[in-house]
Amino acid sequence: MKKDLSNIKKAKYLLDKNHCVAIPTETVYGLAANAYSDTAILKIFKLKKRPKSNPLIVHYCKAEDIKNDCELNSNFKKLYNKFCPGPLTFILKLKKNSKISKYVTNGKKTLAVRFPKNLETGKLLKSLNYPLAAPSANIYTQISPVSKKDVKDEFGKKISFILDGGSSKVGLESTIIDLVNKVKILRLGGIEIDKISKVLKRKLKYSKEKNKMQVPGQSKLHYSPNIPIRLNAKKPFPDEAFILIQKRKGFDKKYFYLTKNKNLKEAGKNLYSTLRKIKNLKFNKIAIEKIPNSGLGLTINDRLKRASKR
């Protein structure tokens, strides 16, 4: 317990000094900095090599903490009460007197907010008097990190500190919902659309509009191991690592499985770690069998399609 507290104090000290710190969340590890500080936020973009045109998600401890930055509405309250803390990001109207750095929003009048479900990061957020902007702790368009080791692999000693929270429990980024304009899903993520629709009592769909509001994780190439990926494969070619949805007997070392019994929640949790493992084993190509395109399978397929773009 004392070690945990000392780590949180160290993270707080560095964040107070406008440094970037990697933090654990239930989705993926984030590269965090003071969302009110231009200096700190610019360090995120530099470290990640991320375009400044791509807005950041801001992390808060609880709903009460966002009242100075955003305008709340009834849909937010319904979804917050059901899913938060958890893997859901809300697009809300930014208040004029908010202290949020202009670099977080790219000058937009909206803000993406989230309430992460992780014990260590929850304690850290409670100790701060500002929220944390925290995109995934990886180089832009690369595989998202789901452990402390993954972050080290990405950045080495370029990050001041990594707050260890074990492996991410969800392993997929948050679902993003727009609550400012017409209510719609802007990014598929760790909460299924059907579950959100049930709470709001309306049918929601994933918005694929070309000119929609820019949100994280929507570039054509993203979540990539920098290895060619062949989707919906029935069997691998000789030079390919092969990812299976379910564990089977009798396969050699170039076969990797996401689940033991086709559980899509487990498959989502293991997706990025499997891609990273294959990359670290120096395979030159990846084939993956067809993933069911329903529930969390929609999110998994979205990530794989973007990762396979060349």
Describe the function of each predicted region:
Residues 1-310:
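Active-site-adjacent structural elements in enzyme catalytic cores
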